[in-house]
Amino acid sequence: MNDHAPAPVAAYDLLRHEILHGALMAGERLRAADLRARYGLGLTPIREALLRLAAEGLVRLEANRGARVSAVSVIELRDLMRTRRAIEALCLREAIARGDDAWEAEILRAMHMLSRAPVPRSPDQRDQIAHWQAMHQQFHHALVAACGSPWLLRIWADLADHSERYRKLRLLANRSLPPSERDVTVEHNAIMEAVLDRDADRAVALMDAHLGRTEALVVDLLDDISELTATEGNTA
């Protein structure tokens, strides 16, 4: 984020970052006065930011009641991930066809940085979660960066940001993740090797399976939350 950005841009960047990274949770009320105090910005840029984020689907505006962080749902997640898999496959095929030695070197660098970031296993490891998430995003971006289409990359980046919101929800869930749940390092290495071998079909298949496993894990979490909420409602 740019520390010298105009106030409306700064407000948008700060709010978007906190929503995507779990500092502002799904369903949380967003009061303009509270956000002004939180960010040290005026009400006008805060309101402009809320309108922009509502257009992106990250904020829900409520008549005469302000705004809330948009809810998460299995339906939205499935739609989001289906779209991301399609776009990421297209980007990946184009990047494999177009990528040069510098692109390959950046993939190797990004994979090295990701492999050095410990996979978080507890919601208490917030700094570790943030670092791993950043390295993970960099790796996925490196894979598709040579696709040659600014439009595709913008669409991919937006889908990746929204899907990371769901991934972060799982990482911040009040449960520890068992080490045997899955080995994402093995998955990432397999994808990287297929990409560097210029085997587009294998790379796309591995990426589709990789994203599908993440989707399944988050769906399980959302189902558990729904069941818990229903149980609490029945016992209230």
Which stretches of residues belong to each language-model region?
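Conserved amphipathic alpha-helical segments that form helical-bundle/coiled-coil interaction surfaces
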Residues: L80, A97, D101-R170, E187-A194, ...
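Short, solvent-exposed segments of well-ordered alpha helices
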Residues: A71-R78, R126, A130, R175-P178
